[in-house]
Amino acid sequence: MDILFAQIQADLRSNDALRQSSALLQALQQSAAGRDISVIAKSAVEEIVASPASAVCKKLAFDLIRSTRLTPDLWDTVCSGVKTDLHFPDPDVTAAAVSILAALPAFSLPKLISDCSSEIASCFDSPSDNLRFSITETLGCILARDDLVTLCENNVGLLDKVSNWWARIGQNMLDKSDAVSKVAFESVGRLFQEFDSKRMSRLAGDKLVDSENSLAIRSKWVSSMVDIVWRKRSALMARSLVLPVETFRATVFPLVFAVKAVASGSVEVIRQLSKASSAAAAANATVVDSNAEKLVGVSDLVTHLAPFLASSLDPALIFEVGINMLYLADVAGGKPEWASQSIIAILTLWDRQEFSSARESIVRAVVTNLHLLDLHMQVSLFRRLLLMVRNLRAESDRMHALACICRTALCVHLFARESARRGQKPLPGTDIISLFEDARIKDDLNSVTSKSLFREELVAMLVESCFQLSLPLPEQKNSGMESRVIGALAYGTGYGALNWTEPALEVVEVCRPCVKWDCDGRTYAVDCYLKLLVRLCHIYDTRGGVKRLKDGASQDQILNETRLQNLQRELVKDLQEVNTPRILGRLIWTIAEHIDLEGLDPLLADDPDDPLNIIIANIHKVLFNLDAAATTSNRLQDVQAVLLCAQRMGSRHARAGQLLTKELEEYRNHAAADTVSKHQTRLILQRIKYVSNLPERKWAGVSETRGDYPFSHHKLTVQFYEPSAAQDRKLEGLIHKAILELWRPKPTELTLFLTKGVDSTSIKVPPTAYPLTGSSDPCYIEAYHLADTNDGRVTLHLKIINLTELELNRVDIRVGLSGALYFMDGSPQAVRQLRNLVSQDPVQCSVTVGVSQFERCGFWVQVLYYPFRGARGEYDGDYIEEDPQIMKQKRGSKAELGEPVILRCQPYKIPLTELLLPHKISPVEFFRLWPSLPAVAEYTGTYMYEGSGFMATAAQQYGASPFLSGLKSLSSKPFHRVCSHIIRTVAGFQLCYAAKTWHGGFVGMMIFGASEVSRNMDLGDETTTMMCKFVVRASEASITKQIESDIQGWCDDLTDGGVEYMPEDEVKATAAEKLKISMERIALLKAAQPKKTSKIEEESENEEEEEGEEEDDDEEVKEKKEKEEGKDKEEKKKKEKEKGTFSKLTAEETEHMALQAAVLQEWHILCKDRKYTKVN
């Protein structure tokens, strides 16, 4: 291999173009085979890029550079070579040099563009088609990127040049050369796409913070290109028709985007964002006569595109045209025919099984635009789409498509019903039962076992969609795709609070067979189903039977309630066929809690098919089922649920009470019952007996239905890693994500600007920078980082200032990594070479890295600067100057760098919280998930807060209480605040937060706070120390391990240094000390209190003394006195009773008593701990 590499290097050094090109081809082959060719790349840079060579060799050398890593020194050489090539007389060599601009690293590109702007501009006027093509393609890639926009923001001269370059690219769309025209269309399309998605900037590794100016710059470019395309649309459409058919596809998107921007009016907002002065805006603005002209522009474009849907043979072109016509169908005045034409063409691709690589894209395109079709077409496509979705491989695409389909089903159902109510002819097949009538879907739902997860996804998605429909619909201010859907749903529900229950009722009927499924221990889909069923039973109050017309019930309500009652009867029969032990107890609870016991047929009392008998037989089955393993059933929970059902059913209905008493007596005396269950059963039996004796006091054993489903698919901590539990969690995550993306989408920044206009709150503030060097160091460096959660990347931005009075010719910045960070190109460290640093002139550079997992990580920066850099070494020797070999050596000889001065900087640590994302979750879901999380970390922290007496309590009505001051910064951290409970007497609280790591792990955090009462016991004094107990639970042990490895660091990340960590030993010691002091004080208080005695007692004492002195008193007198005392005592007791329940204790005394009780209780616990430690 060394011989081959030596041969290639020798060929590169020769001046023979043929040998050089074959050597470069060989090197490229070696690179493609995965070998390290950095040695050859160095030779190629020095011998070909930095020297005159043929266009072919230059192109091959640049391809070689792209396929390997170069050092910063070599990149410098490449840049100087490119500068010389831009002046080269052969346009092909210049074209090759221009093409490498897009591959230059972000730290060297801006300077090159600034230095060579005039040469770049002259390339547009070149007679060579190749050079015009190269410059249009390269600039189209670079100019839309974030880093270039930021460069223009800081350099007004460059901004004007780049704006002119965009205008030239726009003109090139009408260029005489087909290749140039096509690539100009692509470049303009890329600018439009980048405006919305920022995809290219992320690929370049620079996700910068959008400032107001950078947004204005990009908006200016976009609005000017939209104007160009709109003004010249007829010429551009004609030019695109003359292009070869295979390149026509590139022309579609720019035309469609610009025409839609003008027709929908969004170009006006883009102009406002660009902040152009009113005169300039007036000069550039397109004068549009009326809406009619806009509509004509749109229909012209549709007429131009439509023939390609029918006649084209290229699947990619049909797809592109179809997608863009759907985009146009959404414009005000767009026709459903445009949408139906496109969707039919796209579905034909599916039928022809062409374009199979884009199956997901085809389905996504169709399902997201279903609402543009008329009702007939939606219904006719429905079953077909359902089968298409079933066959999708990618989970996220399948979920999104399924969410769209479920929403469409609800839309169609509601819309058709409402239209029929308003007197229109009802359309057959629009109800949910008919839409899901397909034989294959029915078979899947009705079979007990199934290998695919699709049926579970379908049931869960339908149910979750119903719950979304029950929530208020999101407001839509702009017209667009979403507003049509929301309009249809609002029309269908008639803005009525309970109209969503009609389609939900049909969903519950369609999905009924799911309770019989055997899903290998998975329960998420069935839990979702039962949750919806419980909600509907609660809303329609099925416990109270079917309401009547004379009670004020409407016909629809009576019909719905009858259907629900019948469904309950069917489910009772299904109890015999339930195949998942976990589900049996839950289904019994769902039915028993809501069934109408009064409405049961008394004639069937002895019949085994009587619903009550079936329910009680299944309760018996759950109570006495000892064989089930802990993994398949949750016996503890099932028994609790069933006992609760028994109590409530027995209290509601006399016959049920009799039957259940027998069952419970048997269970109580059976070995299956543990001690707790026996006690509970005894209590339940007493309640049933009490209610049977006093029927008017049923409330003792029954409570109202709440509509809440108390079970969850989350299993115990021990079972967290079980496959079925993991699949359930994954399915839940996918479904929730798809539902939220569809029903409650987060608006993009652009959408926010288009709807709300320019609002400074939506523009991010750059983060604060931290100095990494000391104030006396010759180079000052400060740094800040930006995290891009989409791609899992972190960018470190450095600002370097030369604090010496000399100009530093060269400064190297080396960046190393620790923890989970890695460079995208796999190199061990990054080096940025900065040249000619003028004194006090700040220079910026950045490093982008990936993050592989949730772990503490940091950047380690080292500065090498060369204050003694000498001049170029002279070549001494008596050779002839003209010798080409000597000339080459002279050119290649490097200037002497001299000895570098090395400056090590402070490490830049990435806070752990930066690797988290807020996870929105409801309190109910949070508390159900909490016990199942296996990894736990607990620690105590303290902080001081200002305030005294009443001001320090949470009882303030207005203004923030000072006692949460130490946790203020939590609001800016990536945690979702699930709920908070504040104790409103002294400062005590419980806060719950939820987050997810970038890699999907769940982190839940609870903070319990208790204010420390100051030294003397009176509450009027200052209470300034807050003790916080932090409990963190996570789905993976590695997460809590990282937190526990440096708890103070984690506290600082969370609270910006507000909370100080207290080790457990200190906590126990301080608690013991405080308790000791408190006990002493209580003893002193008790000793100091004078005994309160009544007058009667004093009198009796006096009498006793007198008796001691005078022994000869009469016994009768004594008896009389005792009787009087007895009467007095009775009267006093009566008076106390008459006073009522008001205590004689004052507030302070009550507080003291409460404190004493708490102190004693804690004292006992500490004593127990001591005994335990002694024993151990």
Swiss-Prot record:
Tissue expression summary: Expressed at the pollen tube exit site in germinating pollen.
Keyword check for Coiled coil: yes
GO MF terms, alphabetically ordered: identical protein binding
Keywords of this entry: Calcium, Coiled coil, Cytoplasm, Cytoskeleton, Phosphoprotein
Ranges of biased composition (kind: Acidic residues): 1098-1116
Phosphoserine carried by residues: 1100
Subcellular location: Cytoplasm, Cytoskeleton, Phragmoplast
InterPro entries: ARM-like (IPR011989), ARM-type_fold (IPR016024), TPLATE (IPR037501)
Principal localisation: cytoplasm
Coiled-coil stretches: 1071-1156
Domain of life: Eukaryota
Ranges of Basic and acidic residues composition bias in the record: 1117-1149
GO biological process, one term: cytokinesis by cell plate formation
A GO term from the CC aspect: plasmodesma
Gene deletion effect: Male sterility due to the production of shriveled pollen unable to germinate.
Region (Disordered): 1088-1149
PANTHER family linked: PROTEIN TPLATE, TSET COMPLEX MEMBER TSTA
Family recorded in the similarity comment: Belongs to the TPLATE family.
Subunit structure: Interacts with CLC2 and CHC2.
Primary role: Functions in vesicle-trafficking events required for site-specific cell wall modifications during pollen germination and for anchoring of the cell plate to the mother wall at the correct cortical position.
Protein name: Protein TPLATE
Gene of this entry: TPLATE
